[in-house]
Amino acid sequence: MSEETVQRIRALAIPPAWTDVWICPYPMGHLQATGTDAAGRRQYLYHERWRARRDAEKFDRMLTFAHRLPQVRERVDSDLERRGLPREKGLAVAVRLLDLALFRVGSESYTRDHGSFGLATVRRDHVRTSGDVIRFDYRAKSGQRRVQEVRDAELAPIVRTLKRRRDDNAELLAYRGGTGWRDVRSEDVNAYVKELAGEGYSAKDFRTWHGTVFAAMALAVGGEVPGTQAARRRRISDAVKEVALELGNTPAVARASYIDPRLLDRYEEGFTIGGALADVSDGDLADPAFRDAVEAAVLRLLEDGRPELAAA
């Protein structure tokens, strides 16, 4: 084995706990290594250039998703107005929650294997309501306790109905089908999102878009962009930590997977969404008018950086 190959393998930093490791023999292969971690899950290491290209494509897709969100929300609003609790209304409840609270959609198999929950598997006893407030308290991915509150006058009574329904299923989300209740499953939610937003989109795209929106707000609330690179990078680091806390991820994962890098580039250039809004620190993303203004400002900043609208 050549010294060059040895150095490439070392640079992959394959975790020592991995077993059944395979390493690509070609330095430019898009998949550089695979292995099984200590929890028995198959893991993958990709070439940096391939990951960068895929990440760029993902965030470009997010811009299209953001442009389609108004029509998605319009359909969700319409389905929430249906009488009773038919399938469309049950799925609309799920998507409204995805849009408001940064949930992972979860899956039945992941809950079974790891004992943690996402939106599709959260149980009735994980949820409390008080007036317009819905409070979720559950064990999320990696065993983290997640406490999330949603204030929504339309959703709260529907959630109370779901909690009080008479059937043996522990999961919160359900709809009336035929003569009884049927669980809302993760594949149902993803199919509904695809129907509303288009081919290739899923429940996860709400978290990705909102991660960028939260980062844009965090950077704008910080005030005028600092004049030195070191100070700007400290502000970026603080904003990433805030987003990670909202998402329930590490800062590294939040930055790599949920924050459009162009947003951080714009900040380094001296621009935020602050100039497009009266005061982003006083708004509430649960307010549709404020949310729409913030999202429009983020889109302008990412798509063409219009400084007359975006400068801090």
Residue ranges and their predicted role:
Residues V159, A244, D265, F271-G274:
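Extended hydrophobic/aromatic segments used for targeting, binding, or gating
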Residues M1-F117, T121-I236, V240-L247, A252-A256, ...:
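A positively charged, amphipathic N-terminal helix/segment that binds anionic biomolecules
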Residues D137-R139, Y267-S281:
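Short Lys/Arg-enriched helix C-cap and helix-to-coil transition segments
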Residues L263-G270, L285-A312:
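Short, amphipathic C-terminal "tail helix"
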